[in-house]
A protein has these predicted regions:
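Selective transmembrane helix interface/packing segments
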Residues: 5, 19-323
Length: 323
């Protein structure tokens, strides 16, 4: 049978497949299930020069296409299509929503949505004023608001039922079922290290830009070479300063990735409790335990979703202030 059921978060109905989830003619055991949910939909350039979706277990990630190589063979020119799609979709959704709220704003009779957005803008404005005390920069407010809302929305995808979006993307069929559509799809962009590190790289570019703009190229290089022991100890200073300077931006991306990847991994592991939900009394008990664990972890994870977006925004402001 190719019948496929959801391993859901606590507020979604829990339905489970008997004993195992089936992938076409091959049973998908726990290891395969975890691997499946950690694999991105990838399109890239293969060693033979052709471009295609990746091959996984001898099959293309997208039905009806020919795969020329696996993900590891694509090298640098490999694009995580699901990460790009979800990031752009959420970004456009954020722009559309904010624009609509601003367009319909009323000073006489503000609605609930307008009040909520105004509270959010005030919160971000206060953080900008507290953490960015350099000369007024018109970019900082919009940048901080964009970072917070965009990262929050991407983090929020972690609370969507694990199998819901992949099931829809695959044409409402089991993963890798005969036919289907898109067999692999990760809905959480920040669980792919490319997304958080890409944002951290953007922050790093801004830091370089403002450092050179405000201090000049010579002043910026002097900061990295003449401190903390003076210009005569420049080689030693470089050893201390340059790794520390770039480690902050590296940590900015890794912190977001690590927290959300770990959270998603726990949701996947909890989902395994529902593998035998209808098969035996023990399976029912495991499913009930999974429900309880799902609820507890989801409630806790809401805090992680908000906190990580807030930290990314605040640290961006702090690093730009130092520039």
């Amino acid at each position: 049978s190719n019948k496929f059921f959801f391993h859901s978060r606590p507020w979604v109905t829990i339905i489970a497949a008997p004993n195992k989830i089936l992938m076409a003619s091959k049973e998908l055991n726990s290891t395969d299930y975890i691997e499946h949910h950690l694999t991105n939909l990838t399109y890239g350039k293969c060693p033979d020069g052709t471009w295609s979706f990746a091959e996984v277990h001898g099959k293309s990630q997208v039905a009806g296409t020919e795969a020329s190589c696996n993900i590891s063979e694509m090298g640098f020119w490999a694009f995580q299509v699901d990460t790009l799609f979800m990031s752009v979709l959420l970004g456009l959704g954020m722009i559309f929503f904010m624009r609509r709220v601003a367009k319909n704003a009323s000073s006489s009779k503000p609605g609930r949505v307008q009040n909520a957005v105004e509270y959010l803008v005030t919160l971000v404005r206060d953080q900008v004023q507290d953490n960015f005390t350099a000369d007024k920069n018109p970019l900082m407010g919009p940048l901080a608001l964009t970072i917070f809302v965009w990262v929050f929305l991407m983090n929020l995808m972690d609370l969507i039922p694990i199998d819901l979006v992949p099931w829809i993307a695959n044409g409402f069929a089991a993963p890798n079922a005969e036919g289907g559509a898109i067999h692999y799809f990760k809905v959480l962009p920040v669980a792919d290290i490319n997304a958080p590190m890409g944002m951290a790289l953007g922050v790093l570019i801004l830091i370089h830009y403002y450092s050179i703009k405000n201090k000049g190229l010579g002043g910026f290089l002097a900061e990295l070479t003449f401190q903390p022991y003076g210009k005569w100890m420049a080689p030693i200073n470089v050893i201390f300063e340059i790794p520390g300077f770039y480690a902050k931006q590296l940590a900015l991306g890794l912190r977001l990735y690590g927290n959300l990847f770990a959270g998603e991994m726990i949701f996947i592991l909890i989902a395994l409790f529902f593998g035998g939900f209808f098969s035996s009394f023990t399976g029912v008990l495991a499913g009930v335990a999974g429900l309880a664990l799902n609820f507890i972890w989801a409630v806790f994870h809401i805090l992680v979703v908000v906190l990580q977006a807030f930290l990314f925004m605040v640290l961006t402001l702090v690093y730009l202030q130092q520039a």
